Amino acid sequence: MNYRVQPTAQVADTAEIGAGSSVWELAQIREGARLGEGCVVGRGAYVGTDVRIGNNVKLQNYALVYEPAELEDGVFIGPAVVLTNDHNPRSVDPEGKQKRGGDWEAVGVKVAEGASVGARSVCVAPVRIGRWAMVAAGSVVTKDVPDFALVMGVPARQAGWVGRAGVRLVERDGEPGVWECPQTGALYDEKDGALTERAV
């Protein structure tokens, strides 16, 4: 075994965990879940059945990732974040009978490469969090988030752009639609509500 699982964690026999990953106390990884290499699953975090997680992903303490979520490489899920999976949640059907597993269809949240979801945020499925986007702490995401977008609030709304470093981008003086990372100097172009990286 080339990964670490704490004794109080529960990992299903059919789950796959990549090399160099760590699963901390009281975490639960369900049947068929697949985690890539170098992942960290924090204390009390939950990974649902058949969830797909890429390499170098961090799930902080008490994050809840319900199936059929998909997290690409380099994703950060903050403490107590919830990725939901039921668009019309009910305990009972219209006749008052308790709903069972086959009585509803799970829908997932997709989090693209490098994106971050801040502490105690809720992503209401089905939504996609774009590449390198950032969801501010405490937000409720009900719509897709564009690549590199910074969103915040309830419901979450775009409040700017961020680069790969996670720092808010600044629009260059005299160059409308050209954004720069103050930390790395990387340049980005905005067109029709989308942001793209300039080739280096």
Language-model segments: which ranges?
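Flexible, glycine/small-residue-enriched loop-and-beta-strand segment within the central core
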Residues: M1-P7, S22-R128
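Short Cys/His-rich Zn2+-coordinating modules
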Residues: N56, Q60, G96-Q98, V117, ...
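Cys/His-rich microdomains that often coordinate metals
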Residues: Q158, V167-V170, L187-Y188
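Cys/His-enriched microdomains
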Residues: Q158-W161, W179
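Short cysteine-rich clusters marking metal-coordination/redox-active sites
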Residues: G163, C181-T184
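Short linker/helix segments within small regulatory modules
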Residues: E171-V178
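Short metal-binding segments enriched for Cys and/or His
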Residues: L187-V200
